[in-house]
């Protein structure tokens, strides 16, 4: 296989043919045109593809999404891109009843510090993308929790995570990991960086009690200890509204698997509910939604934690979303999104007494 593209100019018809041919023998790509680019933690670009009809490519769509590291932060975020490539090659084919975009190709190259996935274009499949600005109804939030319960149950306390197991490559959830993996996470706690974030609209929109960098760091260090306690399962880790879509039947699906981890179920559940539901609705619904999730877990054969134990774990996890949406670089999320979601987590952290729980 030739080198992975690291610029849009390197996404060529010969490269695309070579990428897709193993699963579509005899494929011939006549031409491609680079379309819309969508920037974030990773970069997605839409390809308009013309195939040779004689090559039997009628089953392939004329538009595809190529996702990978095409920005200045490619090397810093390589591990996340690699995780998504491995998700599509190793985990997506095994998922039980969880909707994700169809993956047509996934490959990573450590020497290049680049990873690429080629995905179906959901815009052509009748999908509707969820948006931070459009909060969920109770029924929509419950449907998302059903999806998370299915994901969590499939690898609940799985032996596959053990050293030497097929999923040993998946890191444990850690808000402030050591070493190279924590380069980005810990850099956001540098006093100058944190102060700069607090001066942005997201910081102005939340209570000044969250401007205390030292207190935030202590809370994250305590959350690291909390996260080491099982039971552990496979996590998406980033199930905010912008990473969900609805298929043409209105059923939820999950995007952006570049942060897949093993860790406590409460992380995903809290992150989903707090980021996706209006603040006042969250106050009214969250205990019922938590009970709904626990019931869904049980329906998949998992013995769920007791409600009060689950309620404590859920409230502790508010700290993670609060920290990351307060310090999220604008290169990854536009400020209107950072401001909206950070405010939801800040409101929840006060309601939940999260800093006190993580003292």
Each language-model region and where it sits:
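Active-site activation/catalytic loop segments of kinase-like enzymes and analogous catalytic loops
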Residues: 86, 90, 259-262, 266-302, ...
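Conserved NTP-binding catalytic cores of kinases and kinase-like/nucleotidyltransferase enzymes
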Residues: 1-117, 223, 247-252, 359
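ATP-dependent phospho-/nucleotidyl transfer catalytic cores
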Residues: 126-236, 248, 342-359
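Short pocket-lining segment of the protein kinase catalytic domain that shapes the ATP-binding cleft
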Residues: 117-124
């Amino acid at each position: 296989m030739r080198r992975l593209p690291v610029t849009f100019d390197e996404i060529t018809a010969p490269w695309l043919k070579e990428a897709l041919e193993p699963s579509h023998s005899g494929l011939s790509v006549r031409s491609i045109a680079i379309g819309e680019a969508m920037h974030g933690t990773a970069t997605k670009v839409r390809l308009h593809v013309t195939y040779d009809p004689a090559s039997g490519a009628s089953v392939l769509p004329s538009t595809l999404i190529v996702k990978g590291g095409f920005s200045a932060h490619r090397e810093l975020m390589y591990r996340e891109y690699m995780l998504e490539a491995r998700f599509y090659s190793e985990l997506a084919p095994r998922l039980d009843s969880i909707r994700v975009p169809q993956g047509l190709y996934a490959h990573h190259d450590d020497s290049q510090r680049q990873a690429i996935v080629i995905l179906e274009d959901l815009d052509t499949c009748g999908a509707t993308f969820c948006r931070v600005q459009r909060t969920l109804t109770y029924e929509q939030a419950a449907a998302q929790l059903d999806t998370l319960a299915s994901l969590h149950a499939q690898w609940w306390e799985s032996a596959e995570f053990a050293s030497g197991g097929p999923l040993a490559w998946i890191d444990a959830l850690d808000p402030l990991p050591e070493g190279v993996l924590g380069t980005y996470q810990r850099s956001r706690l540098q006093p100058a960086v944190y102060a700069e974030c607090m001066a942005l609209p997201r910081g102005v929109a939340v209570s000044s009690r969250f401007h205390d960098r030292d207190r935030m760091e202590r809370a994250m260090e305590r959350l690291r200890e909390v996260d080491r306690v099982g039971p552990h399962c496979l996590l998406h880790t980033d199930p905010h509204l912008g990473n969900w879509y609805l298929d043409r039947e209105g059923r939820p699906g999950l995007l952006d698997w570049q942060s897949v981890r093993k860790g406590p179920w409460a992380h995903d559940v809290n992150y989903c509910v707090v980021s996706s539901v209006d603040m006042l609705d969250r106050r009214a619904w969250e205990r019922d939604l938590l009970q709904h999730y626990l019931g869904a877990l049980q329906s998949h054969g998992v013995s769920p934690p007791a409600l009060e134990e689950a309620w404590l774990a859920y409230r502790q996890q508010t700290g993670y979303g609060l920290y990351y949406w307060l310090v999220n670089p604008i290169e990854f999320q536009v400020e209107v999104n950072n401001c909206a979601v950070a405010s939801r987590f800040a409101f929840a952290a006060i309601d939940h007494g999260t800093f006190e729980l993580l003292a």
